[in-house]
A protein has these predicted regions:
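Bacterial N-terminal signal peptides
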Residues: 8-19
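Catalytic cores of phosphodiester-bond hydrolases, prominently lipid phosphodiesterases
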Residues: 25-371
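Sec/Tat signal peptide C-region and signal peptidase I cleavage site
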Residues: 20-24
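Bacterial N-terminal signal peptides that target proteins for export
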Residues: 1-9
Length: 371
């Protein structure tokens, strides 16, 4: 979405001496945003479960049969990742499932084309929402999704930093339905890191070591405004492990302050790895979010969930998310998503934009647009 607001903000920052011409640090503007803004000073509308296709008729029938009470909440989907980037989305989410030996999630693909069967039988993390029920994805493996990101980035090297939430899920057995005990272990988390580094390359990444800098801990680096500017971070991706406490403990094992790791994580504020927070429900948590972003942390929240806001036309959650100052506001209903029901609800930032100066952390003035 095109808006004059980023250009106005760039001009304002130039007048304040906060932005200048392109230097060795990078361009003066990135996608119309002032290059000297730090990542934590920008608010973006993102997508939730970004890999998820809109359910096919076959998938709808399967969900209605196996889990009818969940159908309404799963009745959404997104265009391919490249199409989301073309729209202007710069924060996405990819759900990953452990498959170190290969074949764990291959059963639904027994009658698929041979190349697809081969892909699902190969070792490596797969991308899906829930085994046997909600598994249709624009890219079947984590490696394949990363390849899409890298290919798009190579074709658009001046893009804003893109934040990727990597939602690592365990799937314990469910009697009579799912017989496996699929859990992420250290080796699986190491493999995610290896895939990220191999596909994306160091020159396309923002990693914890960069943000920590010379500080003793990652949290200290964050509090000292260690996030890169848009000029320094353009063309790069920031990956965030979205998991559970067991995963977080494993992920920092041998990597204090996430030294040498490719991803950030959702660690508590008092921990040395604290950097990014996930506060899914912004309503009633606005003060907490403002506290965190004012301290230098990144916060992700959601504008809508499980199709509820779209069905009700309820923008209260969106409004709370946007005004809270959370840098990433995820939605299933931005312009360009499949909308077969014709819901009027649409998520965007004020002015209809998908990214803007953050109203709490940026030099934006009262409206969060420009000073």
């Amino acid at each position: 979405m095109v808006s004059a607001l980023p250009r106005l903000l760039a001009a304002a920052l130039l007048s304040l001496g906060l932005a200048g011409p392109a230097t060795a640090q990078g361009p003066a503007t990135v996608e119309g945003m002032p290059g000297q803004l730090r990542l934590d000073q920008v608010q973006m509308l993102g997508s939730h479960n970004s890999y998820k296709r809109y359910p096919s008729a076959e998938e709808e029938a399967r969900i209605r049969t196996l889990a009818p009470e969940h159908w309404d909440g799963l009745d959404y989907g997104h265009p391919p990742l490249e199409a989301q980037f073309a729209i202007g989305i710069r924060q996405i989410e990819i759900d990953v499932a452990p498959d170190p030996q290969g074949g764990l999630y291959a059963t639904p693909y027994q009658l698929a084309a041979s190349e697809m069967r081969k892909t699902m039988m190969a070792p490596g993390a797969k991308v899906l929402h829930f085994p046997q029920i909600d598994y249709e994805s624009h890219c079947l493996t984590f490696h394949a999704c990363l390849t899409v990101l890298r290919r798009w980035s190579d074709g658009h090297p001046e893009h804003l930093p893109v934040t990727v939430l990597v939602n690592a899920s365990d799937f314990p057995p469910i009697a009579g339905f799912w017989l496996h005990d699929a859990k992420f272990e250290v080796a699986d988390l190491d493999a995610l890191d290896a895939d990220i580094r191999a596909v994306m390359g160091a020159d396309h990444l923002i990693v914890p070591d960069m943000v920590r800098g010379a500080h003793a801990t990652l949290a200290e680096g964050v509090r000292a405004h260690g996030w890169p500017t848009l000029a320094a971070g353009h063309g790069r991706f920031l990956f965030v492990l979205d998991a559970n406490d067991r995963h977080y403990a494993l992920y920092r094992q041998g990597h204090p302050s996430l030294r040498g790791r490719a991803m950030f994580g959702y660690y508590a504020e008092q921990e040395s790895e604290a950097s990014v927070f996930n506060i899914q429900e912004p309503r009633g948590h606005e003060a907490e979010i403002r506290h965190l972003v004012s301290a230098g942390f990144l916060v992700r929240t959601r504008a809508d969930a499980d199709t509820r806001e779209a069905r009700a036309g309820d923008v209260s959650r969106l409004d709370a998310a946007v005004s809270s100052g959370a840098q990433f506001v995820s939605s299933d209903y931005y312009d360009g998503v499949p909308n077969p029901h014709g819901f009027a609800y649409r998520a965007s930032l004020p002015g209809g934009v998908l990214h803007r100066c953050d109203p709490v952390t940026g030099p934006c003035g009262q409206q969060g647009h420009h000073r």
